[in-house]
């Protein structure tokens, strides 16, 4: 092991910081004063790769019982153990959330084998979490019993003292004898419980990392290290090699934790056969070793700290033989992703790990029965269905073991495809009718098995018709009450003929195919009809490309459609092909974005009033989306179970095998309004459905809530949170995610007040946006006829409103893409901008889009199509900059872009020619200018960097410029771009920004040596305050406050520990 290849220091001037918290102690008084505990770092949780070495006499847990109880020590160890177990649980919960989200993202572009592997990981993590929870309950139970015995023992002890001081008598002596017996019993019980608790402490895996010393270790030196922990021993010898490496005869050892006992470490230098020089001996605390993550410690062996022993200690709550699941196993997850492209378009014909089955929808062959899917399911579904007498019995027939409402998953939509490149999908048609409750039998003799297949179910008849080449599915919902009417479809009952009538407006389906399956169910029309105008329902198209038939039926019946009028906003439009990038925001549903925001907000909710205001508005919005008032109530709540059961009876067509019973909160929000293009063929059908049945959503949703107790909640409802408009749903998700990002930045920069204030102002504006969205969601979307109804202030900015309407498309007016806005800006303003500043139009438009999105760096062209801009972002940006005319504002941005261009010319060598044109008076404090200035400071040319440095120093005298620059550069320190971080450090140096000292101190903990060096130099350049901060960092890094930084920031998460170099790189965490 090469000690030189590791850095055990957070970055002091000498490269290694002295350990002050873990010096151990010996018989000397001054060394006792240095006794402290092991410390913890934040390296990634590791999985043991193999069975590690144990002492030969430690094959079993401790069975010896202590002679005397140690209640104070037990309490300390219990607290440490409980914290460690809770931390383990939290780490695994985080990993479970990440894997679940990854599974959901992969469902659309992956195959069955990949999903199966990932789901196995999820199941393993869940099992391990359940085991942890059970382990925690056992520990709590033992400690509770221990506390009871301790109180009894204390009581008996006090009674002993009382009787000892009282006059002696026969009764007193008898009582004292009884008390002594009880006291002994309670003491033995405490000792027994201590032994049992000790068996639940898990294992410490200690890995030898080598010795480190300041010019103390020489090639050829031999050392012997002896560790003693109770009755456990570990002795190993090592030698310092010529190349600086160290060779040791042992690398790792497992110690069983003890309640009473400290680890004693003795290091001796071997000079000869009988010559051993004691280097040092220390005794170390162990209670702080109960942590979920591996900890690297540097132990001061001698008084001066010139010899350090580096160990990596990992605690496992269970035996190492019981290998933990791969939490944080990034390599396996990435391997899964690499394998995604290796799978063909077909899916394996293998059953999954649940009661569901996956079926491969093959292209029909001439000699192949065309109803193979129904034949395969006949034994498991239709046989049971044949014996049922009503739809209320159907929940017991479901293939899924779940009770209650079905949880709809989102597997790839091509799960019914075959392996060929061009596949043809077979349509299914579901027709609901009021059929008499009588047994139906298939024809006695059928010429072709697939021509007619009629089950004997009293409620569902299936008839096969000819194949239709068009890959589309129709579900015709036909109401009838009591007897046959023009909407009834008569199925054959023993004969090959069939009669069929269609009301006006219905399109007769083709009878030339043989691959359509019609399923008829008795569903009373009163559930879907409450007024005279809802007397009939038009055919509703279902698309097999959507993959989930049942979900489409629920979604179609519950979509919040309204009558389509020319003056209405096109906010109910579905996501079309031109806006594929928007789908990711629907995949990341409102529930997920809401959960992410609340998780980020919860620990810090009491710190700022703005956090509390945002929390209140977000919860208000959540309540509105959960409890949106239905248009009208169902006439009979009992009828809702009929529809629910009828839809659940089609679960055999559902492709969701990866849903868990408790996975209801993982719904993907596709938006109720997005049903138009998915289910309807023509605008006539869309408008007729909207006109006649706007209350369908209200009926079904309210009925399900009444009868099942499950409404539109996140966890239990088949209906995901939605406003009824895809566009508004995307807008909500975008702003929830932006609020989460702001909270994370506020938490990171909370020690820099001027940055925090600016971020809190942005968060306050987002709170107002949430309030506005809640008002819009409360109202019926059909009553909003223009954006001025949603944002009344747009009346004062009609030119901006007109441009926004040009940027929006059929997917809705509440959002657009950055790509669309760029194209529209080019159409409307390119000529004007290029006339004023030739060649800068595209640059100016990109700057505008980046600023609307509140990005510190320009938006990449490759991500333009997927970047979402909401109408609230658009309006708030121009309102905050007091812009009424977009054209004039673009010309202003063009002048700023010309300044950036001049700065770039300085980089190209035209220094003397352009530096005179740039001075502190005409230098605008815009982020593009500030970014260009900072990046120029990174130039290797001294002439360029010196010129820019003098320019920044001069502009620092301008109070307005300096304030804007400080805010931008401090926010840049939180970005993952290392070059931008370095440039921001240099810029703060020349601005003499003493306000940024605390953020620079945090950067001094970075693993990147260049960043650490620049941050340290910047600290030292900030006068006395900076020097003192650097010295404090050098001498006592453990005094730094813990940073609570989210993973999106990609910055080191520092903890209040010492003797560590905890760093974050672009690839991930590293710990030394």
From Swiss-Prot:
It comes from the Eukaryota. Residues 447-460 have a biased composition (Polar residues). Keywords: Cell adhesion, Cell membrane, Cell projection, Chemotaxis, Coiled coil, Cytoplasm, Cytoskeleton, Differentiation, Hearing, Membrane, Myogenesis, Signal transduction inhibitor. GO terms for biological process: cell adhesion; cell differentiation; cellular response to chemokine; chemotaxis; muscle organ development; negative regulation of cell adhesion; negative regulation of establishment of T cell polarity; negative regulation of protein localization to cell leading edge. Residues 439-465, 683-718 are annotated as: Disordered. Residues 173-470 are annotated as: Necessary for interaction with NCAM and myoblast protrusion formation. GO terms for molecular function: 14-3-3 protein binding. InterPro entries: ARM-like (IPR011989), ARM-type_fold (IPR016024), FAM65_N (IPR031780), RIPOR3 (IPR026136). Expressed in myoblast and myotubes (at protein level). Expressed in brain, eyes and skeletal muscle. Its main location: cytoplasm. Residues 83-112 form a coiled coil. It is found in: Cytoplasm; Cytoplasm, Cytoskeleton; Cell projection, Filopodium; Apical cell membrane. One of its GO terms (cellular component) is stereocilium. Residues 683-698 have a biased composition (Basic and acidic residues). It holds the Pfam family PL48. Belongs to the RIPOR family. Homooligomer; homooligomerization is regulated by RHOC and leads to the formation of concatemers through the association of N- and C-termini. Interacts with NCAM; this interaction is necessary for myoblast protrusion formation. Acts as an inhibitor of the small GTPase RHOA and plays several roles in the regulation of myoblast and hair cell differentiation, lymphocyte T proliferation and neutrophil polarization. Plays a role in fetal mononuclear myoblast differentiation by promoting filopodia and myotube formation. Maintains naive T lymphocytes in a quiescent state and prevents chemokine-induced T lymphocyte responses, such as cell adhesion, polarization and migration. Involved also in the regulation of neutrophil polarization, chemotaxis and adhesion. This is Rho family-interacting cell polarization regulator 2.
